[in-house]
Amino acid sequence: MSAIAVTARDDRIEGAVYLVLYMLCIPAANWMIGNVGTFCVPNGGPCMVPVAPGLMAPSGVLTVGLALVLRDLVQRRLGRWWSLAAIAVGAALSALLAAPSLVIASTAAFLLSELADFAVYTPLQQRRFILAVIASSAVGLVVDSMLFLWLAFGSLDFLVGQIVGKAWMVVVSLPFIWWLRERDARRAESFVAARG
């Protein structure tokens, strides 16, 4: 088996891992909103977690921040249509764990932010991978937060906390994104050297 075939197979396996993690982030975030937090807002409001001093957000925020990065990795390894399939599977799993209003709100928010991600990440990823992840996540987290909060709770009261919490997860992921870019560059260089 050639080195190129091995790398392609490894990329698909790596992509499958990202895909499974991404699919699981969606129901995990929805479940957390109703069950995990330092306190829960009465009368069906979300459970909240601190994301900065004096700033709270619905508890699924950190998981969604991770999902924003994972979907870029799914697209990089498997293609953008796999990320849409992951949203569908994640929504179906969410229906088993969360209130219908959360499932509808999160599915709509993930889909719209995915379309925004396509517009930003897809054209940038080959030339500027780290910039693509940062830019698409920034756009996606704002779109996702606004639509989700409006559909799930009828207000944007938690918008700043949502944005900050998701941004933290993007920032935390950047060393891994940098490592991934460097590893991919080293592999590409070794293929060129082996062919030359």
At which residue positions do the language-model features occur?
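Cytoplasmic-side transmembrane-helix entry/capping segments in multi-pass membrane proteins
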Residues: 14-19, 78-89, 128-135
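Helix-boundary and loop/linker segments of multi-pass membrane transporters
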Residues: 11-12, 79, 96, 125-126, ...
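N-terminal membrane topogenic signal
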Residues: 3-21
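The first (N-terminal) embedded transmembrane alpha-helix
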Residues: 16-33
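Alpha-helical membrane segments and adjacent membrane-interface helices in multi-pass membrane proteins
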Residues: 31-39, 43-111
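Membrane-embedded alpha-helical hairpins and interfacial helices in multi-pass inner-membrane proteins
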Residues: 103-195
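C-terminal ends of transmembrane helices
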Residues: 3-6, 67-77, 118-125, 177
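Short, intrinsically disordered terminal tails adjacent to the first/last structured region
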Residues: 1-6, 190-196
